[in-house]
């Protein structure tokens, strides 16, 4: 595939960039368990701190490499930098959190085969469903780039990919608050603390929406001109940027509600995710390959495939369970945000 889309390029820099990218992707996936370990022991703040530091390091290296005109190799190097920094800091914080490293070294327990098999059977019931959900999410996000490389010019593919990266960075940052509240939500749900569940959930969803709006506005007003200054040929239109941002927003918005369901071990949404991931890719091929709609074909396909079902159905399920509609949830989220801000300044 890489040879196919880069057939007109000279030299081997794109293949070197691809090799570095594959190595970086492997490292990020392989050491991803450290994030779960940190959250599992309660070090949520440390986990989020590591993510911010690693992303900052990636952006700094990316800008520096682009200024040095290293092209795709620079992008790949910045990505592997993110993975290395992430792994080192995850390990650092985990082994120093409440003397975990010291306690592990003093532990003499060696797991036996039967214990491992029993644990695997217990986890597998929901683990394969979560895996299917992760695959569906990856399929939705990454297939757009592949389809664009088949039907769009190299310049358009680059513009689309950059727009996706910027939008993803914004919503990932906005979603961090929700992620940090996951242990609190899980505890409140398991203890049947309905009031606390409503307040925490409303607060995190409201904050996610507000930060996404502010972040997207900042990217459109400030980010685009800065990128154009660094890379003049990278002209991301306002419409495309807003379209890609809206798609990334509804993905995480949907995830707010499905994560709420998974907190009580209900992965009831995995089939819908898989079905509409296939619908998404089918629409992308149809709109780009048959109707030649370019980047807008990708955006429309992605948005429509989620709006058909996932974006409205799972919020409706959760709202019914919480006995509140979206307006009431946002109102409660606003009040909780205001109260927390007041407490911090008192």
Where are these regions (language model features)?
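Helix-terminus/linker motif at the lipid-water interface of multi-pass membrane proteins
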Residues: 3-6, 64-69, 131, 138-169, ...
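Interfacial/gating helices of multi-pass transporter permease domains
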Residues: 72-77, 118-126, 130, 147-168, ...
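Helix-loop junctions and terminal segments of transmembrane helices
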Residues: 40, 98-102, 163, 167-192, ...
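Alpha-helical transmembrane segments of polytopic membrane transporters and translocases
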Residues: 60, 85, 129, 144-146, ...
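Membrane-interface junctions at transmembrane-helix termini in multi-pass inner-membrane proteins
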Residues: 25-51, 242-275
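Interfacial segments at transmembrane-helix termini and the short loops linking adjacent helices
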Residues: 1-20, 154, 194-195, 220-249
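Interhelical loop/hinge segments that connect adjacent transmembrane helices in multipass membrane
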Residues: 72-78, 88-141, 192-196, 320-345
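Membrane-interface helix-loop junctions in multi-pass transport and translocation proteins
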Residues: 10, 45, 56-88, 223, ...
């Amino acid at each position: 595939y890489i040879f196919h889309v880069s057939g007109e390029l000279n030299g081997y820099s794109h293949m070197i960039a691809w090799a570095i990218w594959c190595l970086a992707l492997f490292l990020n996936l392989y050491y991803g368990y450290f994030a779960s370990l940190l959250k599992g022991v309660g070090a949520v703040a440390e986990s989020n701190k590591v993510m911010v530091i690693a992303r900052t390091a990636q952006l700094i290296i990316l800008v520096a490499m682009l200024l040095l005109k290293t092209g795709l190799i620079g992008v790949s190097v910045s990505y592997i930098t993110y993975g290395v920094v992430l792994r080192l800091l995850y390990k650092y914080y985990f082994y120093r959190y409440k003397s975990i490293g010291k306690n592990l070294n003093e532990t003499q327990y060696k797991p036996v085969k039967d214990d491992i098999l029993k644990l695997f059977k217990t986890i597998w019931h929901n683990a394969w469903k979560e895996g299917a959900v992760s695959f569906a999410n990856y399929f939705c996000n990454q297939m757009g780039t592949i389809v664009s490389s088949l039907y769009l010019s190299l310049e358009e593919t680059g513009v689309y990919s950059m727009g996706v990266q910027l939008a993803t960075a914004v919503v990932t940052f906005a979603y961090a608050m929700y992620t940090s509240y996951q242990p609190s939500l899980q505890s409140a749900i398991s203890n049947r603390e309905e009031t606390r569940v409503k307040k925490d959930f409303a607060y995190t969803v409201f904050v996610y929406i507000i930060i996404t709006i502010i972040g997207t506005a900042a990217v459109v007003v400030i980010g685009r001109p800065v990128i154009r200054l660094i890379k003049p040929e990278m002209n991301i239109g306002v419409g495309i940027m807003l379209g890609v941002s809206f798609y990334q927003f509804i993905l995480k918005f949907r995830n707010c509600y499905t994560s709420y369901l998974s907190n009580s071990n209900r992965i009831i949404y995995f089939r819908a995710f898989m079905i509409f991931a296939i619908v998404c890719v089918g629409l992308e091929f149809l709109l780009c390959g048959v109707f030649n709609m370019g980047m807008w074909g990708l955006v429309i396909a992605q948005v429509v495939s989620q709006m058909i079902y996932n974006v409205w159905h799972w919020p409706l399920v959760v709202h019914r369970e919480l006995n509140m509609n979206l307006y009431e949830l946002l109102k409660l989220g606003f009040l909780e945000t205001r109260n927390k801000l007041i407490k911090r300044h008192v």
